[in-house]
């Protein structure tokens, strides 16, 4: 972890390793790790973990996953800079699950997150990916019962994800024992510092074993984050995934003006013949909407399948398998799974609801034309959505035109 500032590059440094001198331009780190493994099968993951990865719906690693999973598994300290929504959570979750020993009932990995919601989200991802591994992941967050927290930690969770204040409290009370800890991961480090958790982060760090591996993920690299990396890490591997690795190139984007929300359903039904030419993914913003739309379409005798985070893992696995094999042609889902559905055949994406944040737009539709395939994206836009549509156009420097009548010819 910690090391003197002037240490030169490690002798066995990977390609392009440049020690600890972080060259920063515009708040970006400079990568010193070039290896890209763009297939989960080639990462030498445990069989049960690989099963969990595919069951979750991942097909191919995202840019950050293809670069960062392996160095973390190898035990390097790693700084990864990537925008939110690029698959960072699964990056460290997969690496952690590969490194821990499920037979040891003690905390082996600690993940700190800036908010309770993010901590709980990470917990869900770890549990889902580790579904076949018999591991326990506990969320150690404020606003919950301290006694219950202590009891849970006593039961021997191998992974703890939490907010800095509560984690520090638990370690201090000796409820969270760190003697078996080998990995410390800071997610959204920039956000953590901007929320004033710096002192608490350092306090937690001081209580960890000296040789703990440290992994830090951040969308931006302000000076404060770099100071953290200097204090916590030795010869870190640095990985930068620029925003433009996710591209809208080759994807034709259209909008359909829908006068009011209630009319979207009829619009979709009118498009259904077009939709089923190939496979399509339809995105809604809430799980409830997914269920509602599925019911409505089914009652009109359209064949669709649906998937969201409330479903059992086994159920999601079956749906994903059917969709991948092509036996189900239309999948309705939420953003939770937007990043996992890399299905090669998908050439049409419909945003029944525009995403509630613009970053998710590229995760939904970038999928349609991934890996050099062409794709079409159709956005349903009510008068309330016009501003968001313009915002998306500006953010991605792209143009979204009104859908032509011959859209079927373009798919």
Curated annotation (Swiss-Prot):
GO CC annotation, single? cytoplasmic stress granule
Q: Which example biological process does GO assign this protein?
A: cytoplasmic translational initiation
Q: What is its EC number?
A: 3.6.4.13
Task: Cite a single GO MF annotation.
Answer: translation initiation factor activity
Location within or outside the cell: Cytoplasm
Q: Which residues form the Helicase ATP-binding domain?
A: 69-239
Role of this protein: ATP-dependent RNA helicase which is a subunit of the eIF4F complex involved in cap recognition and is required for mRNA binding to ribosome. In the current model of translation initiation, eIF4A unwinds RNA secondary structures in the 5'-UTR of mRNAs which is necessary to allow efficient binding of the small ribosomal subunit, and subsequent scanning for the initiator codon.
Q: What is this protein called?
A: ATP-dependent RNA helicase eIF4A
Q: Which organism is it from?
A: Mycosarcoma maydis (Corn smut fungus)
